Amino acid sequence: MEEDKYQLVLHNDDLERMVLYDPNSKSLLVRNSTDMLRQKSKQLVLQQQIESPYSPMPSLRSPSIPTTPTLVGGLSSQSHNNNHPSTLHIMCPYCKRSYNNNNNNNINNNISTNNNNINNNSSNNLNNLNNNINNINNGIFNNNNNNNSNSNNNNISGGNNNTMDINGNSIVSGVIAPFNPSPYYRSPISEPPFISRDYFLLLQDSSKSGVNNNNNNNNNDSTTTNNNNNNNTTPPQQQQQQNSSGLNSEFLNIGYYKKFFKEDIKIGSGGFGSVYLCRHLINGVDLGEFAVKKVPVGENLPWLFRVLREVKALETLTKHRNIINYKHSWLEYDQPADFGPKVPCLYILMEYANNGNLQDYMAEKRDLIPENEIWSFFIDLCHGIGYLHHSGIIHRDIKPPNILIHQSYDSITDREVTHLMISDFGTCDTIGPLESLAPPLYKNNIKRTGNTGTIEYLAPELLQKGVNGEYNSDYDEKCDIWSLGILLYQMAYGTLPYRYSGDPFIDEDPNRNLPSLIDEIAGFSNNRLIFPQIPQRSRDLKDMITILLRAKPHERPTISQILSTHFIQSKTKHYTINPIHLPFTKRNKFKNTSVHNTTASTIKLRRKGSISTTNSTTSSSSSTATSSSLSSTTIATTSSSNAINNTTATTTTNSNLGNNNNNNTNALISSRISPIRKTQLVEENSEDSSNEIANINPNRSLIQPIVLSDTDNDDIIIDDDDDDDDSTNNNDTNNTDNTDDEMNSGDVVGIVNNKKSSYSRSSSIRSPSSSNKLRQRTISNSGGNNGIRKALPSLEAPRSGRFKRAAIVIQRGVRSSAVYQAFYMLQALFQVWLCFDQCSTCPNTFPSPILLYPLLLLSLIPILVVNNNNNSNNMNNNNNNNNINSNGQLAHLNGSGGGGIINNGNRDTKKINTIISIIRFIYYFVISVLLPKEISCKSTSHIIPILPPIADYVVFPLLSLFKNLTLLIINLIFIFYRD
């Protein structure tokens, strides 16, 4: 076939595009994905995962971290292997071979061609910086074209150990490298896009050889052909800059970024440079999105060598789910300032995380992050940091802005899942064998003169000075453990464990006192760690924070010790089966505004035909908002062009009304609609609360969620209790502990709109004719700015003149019935005990049937009444739901129809239970106090006992009567409180 002579170098299954390399003409071909090519791509990904070492060379491995794998919780790679990356492998999941640590010496023979280019002629001496920089330049800047040509020829002829031809025939030479025994490698959630390690080098080589990146599409194929070498010519101004610069022109790759990438937006900035979102294009064909970091270097070669430390650290790391994946780097001119000159900049191409960073997410949530999310994030960070430590790298700047949130599609669960990724390796350092094996005298000769990282996340030993004013400690793995503990504390409580740190989410907080903060951190001790009372966190979470924030470094655990604990093993197993998913919100102010929607979930849905193939009008219509006071709360009705803030639309349907198997009374089934669908959005104006909203069309099966409030009262009561919302739990069982997740995802809860109005739940149904003019109000966040909050259904409350607690409104299905049964069963047992206690004063006596059986029957009658009432209510409710569905209207629970039947049933149950309780008390009083004891108690020996003292006839029955009276009061309280 024609494709046999091509080498597959890139495959993006989401975009259904592939890039092939022609070794004869040294050109690149862009083609649509086919079934055969897609199958070959999967084989290449599989081959790449088997042969690639998941840790760097043994010389860079940290000696303090054991290299033996740790089996976590008995998790095997065959049980949901691709669902969550926290599965730790003790055996290769593909070739079924056990790990052999003795084969680690063969890793150097099986590394990729990219690393061969970068590390060609490299020296084993880690202190020889010049040799390392030259080796990096050999790989990155291609100053040695002969070496690159030879390496490319090896790739074409099959010399690369990690390549396979288009027919799937392996061209691997030598012995396949064993699966790396690192316990920190985690299998990917879904099949990642295949990108050859030589792809960007081949692209760069083809660019230098004169590839013309024009639109030459023929039969859905886009071929880059050789052209004249006009593209390599540089303007005279840039030639003068090259001559005056400290960098030779051969180090610069002029026009590479503009030719193959299209810059969209700026997504972040830091001390080293800025990060931009870009799209990789060949002949106008979109091949995916990446993040590129531009670091100005100018003529400062020492600064370039320092920045290259990040590149060196990234290139030694292979693909890991919790680490930002490095792609390529090169030198090129750029203009960092708007009115400044063009200077040489180092471009670092990396993987793009599509859901912002942890700092923005924590600023939105504050201290409301559920513990299930905290533990999932913590496990992700442990695996990422553990992989860095195992690879001989310490990050030295673990903080929320450097932790990115990424969402990927999980083909196993058919939904998106969320995980964290560690980024920004500009301050990282390597842990070489010379540093660990060097004698103490050698270590003392290397003195630390400053600090690297953020003060709030620095370990105390790094700020402690000796008598001579010099720092005592150096950076090691335990510094990252401390930063992880501070990060875990901040996720749990929304603040830092320091007095002078101020608000971590405010850049220039006046309460932040830097000199006092440094002294506080340097003098930190174990007994100074204080946990706030609100929010309440579990003891396990507090214990983990306490262990991580030990003042002495040797008392802190290693990552391998943390992951080997039984508690973390159980958590890892849980999140392997049930990975979390965060709603995709607009918390990232640098959100991608491109018309191309290439997220994995969108592509999968597009293939299924459940959504439209284009959604460019959504982002274009979001710019038509006319006032900044419009809130982000939205409701879904019909298509419109007035989209506000491009937020998620929410709808509520009654198609499944009355089909709840858990006997919930008129449960309203909530559903979620993709934001891609065109929906009409109601504009909420926080300044004018007297605007009127259009009436709800009774012929539609949708309820417009509207936030109501009283103009004279700013109190708004919202039900945030997941345990009291059965409709929400039935729709999303995987996020039952995530209250804020459900609030943002569009599930209906409920609202109180008046000072004297009672609360109605999400299972309540509002009559369309009960209210025509409703006032609206925007719920603002804790910072005072209008945030993205949920629109709640408007329900008109009855004028009862009595305000009840929001969570106690109606009796609901199985849960209420179970509570009644448990209570009355305990009451019956207590009644039996009272009868035996009544007869305990006489020896060899027991309660007579005239005393015991009637009381036991009266105690069990309420159970039968409750079950009968629930069954009748459910039958009437189902009939009423059928009438509602046939008419296409929704009736209020407190109005006519099923709501009235339920309320009448509750009132009847209350009356019956009250009457039965009073009858039981009177009967016990008559039998035990007014009648002789010989009637209420019966002797086992049939011998008339000797009469006891008068105290047993008077005092003891009165005590028993008091106990029964207490039981009556508890019963009445339960009846009126529950009903």
UniProtKB/Swiss-Prot annotation:
One of its GO terms (molecular function) is protein serine/threonine kinase activity. Residues 593-602 have a biased composition (Polar residues). Residues 261-568 form the Protein kinase domain. Residues 212-244, 610-666, 728-737, 753-773 have a biased composition (Low complexity). GO terms for cellular component: membrane. Its EC number is 2.7.11.1. It is a multi-pass membrane protein. It comes from the Eukaryota. SMART domains: S_TKc. Belongs to the protein kinase superfamily. Ser/Thr protein kinase family. This is Probable serine/threonine-protein kinase iksA. It comes from Dictyostelium discoideum (Social amoeba).
